[in-house]
């Protein structure tokens, strides 16, 4: 994230009771960059609680998600936010490439469709990758994820689309998803 060509970002890291050295690493990075914030959850609560906690603490206009094992390309925020602003879009996603567990690209890519509504993603649930989404929270007022074990992001996209929004795809690989 720190390598983004778009510099007006804040990174809210939610530590969901990790057992590695995440907290120490983040605290070191915070000393180098004031845009990094750390929130430690008291108990392991899962992805939905972590994402919702991050959204509650976010101050910016745009919300994006990145899990610890995935990666954004350095131009992701700049290109996708420009795409949103030039077209007045409130919900966007991009194409992404697949990495194996070691971080090697597999040659597989999930291509973004031009646009998707509620019925489109019901037919193709894997259309929108969470790591590629950017939401305009000034126009999408309830982006919070239901506290369910799996597919909480998919349930959220359905809710947003059911409320009349359309998701627009940018067919450029801007992220890497780790299997």
Set out the residue ranges of the language-model regions:
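Short aromatic/hydrophobic "clamp" motif used to bind/position activated sugar donors
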Residues: 63
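Conserved nucleotide-sugar donor-binding catalytic segment
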Residues: 56, 94, 112-179
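Conserved donor NDP-sugar-binding/catalytic core segment of glycosyltransferases
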Residues: 75-106
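A conserved acidic beta->alpha catalytic loop
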Residues: 15-24, 43, 67
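Acidic helix N-cap motif at the loop->helix transition within catalytic regions
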Residues: 20-28, 71, 75
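Glycine-rich, basic loop-to-helix element that forms the pyrophosphate-binding segment
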Residues: 41-58, 79
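The conserved acidic donor/metal-binding loop of glycosyltransferases
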Residues: 67-71, 95
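Short, acidic, metal-binding catalytic loop of nucleotide-sugar glycosyltransferases
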Residues: 1-8
């Amino acid at each position: 994230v720190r390598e983004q060509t778009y510099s007006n970002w804040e990174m809210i890291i939610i530590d969901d009771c990790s057992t590695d050295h995440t907290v120490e690493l983040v605290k070191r990075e915070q000393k180098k960059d004031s845009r990094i914030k750390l929130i430690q959850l008291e108990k392991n609560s899962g992805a939905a609680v972590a994402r919702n906690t991050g959204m509650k603490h976010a101050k910016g206009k745009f919300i994006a998600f990145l899990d610890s094992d995935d990666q954004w390309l350095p131009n992701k925020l700049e290109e996708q936010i420009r795409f949103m602003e030039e077209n007045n879009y409130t919900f966007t996603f991009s194409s992404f490439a697949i990495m194996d567990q070691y971080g090697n690209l597999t040659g597989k890519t999930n291509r973004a469709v031009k646009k998707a509504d509620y019925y489109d993603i019901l037919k193709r649930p894997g259309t929108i990758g969470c790591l590629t989404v950017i939401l305009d929270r000034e126009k999408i007022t309830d982006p919070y994820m239901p506290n369910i074990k799996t597919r909480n992001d998919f349930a959220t996209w359905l809710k947003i689309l059911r409320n009349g929004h359309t998701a627009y795809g940018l067919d450029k690989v801007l992220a890497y998803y780790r299997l």
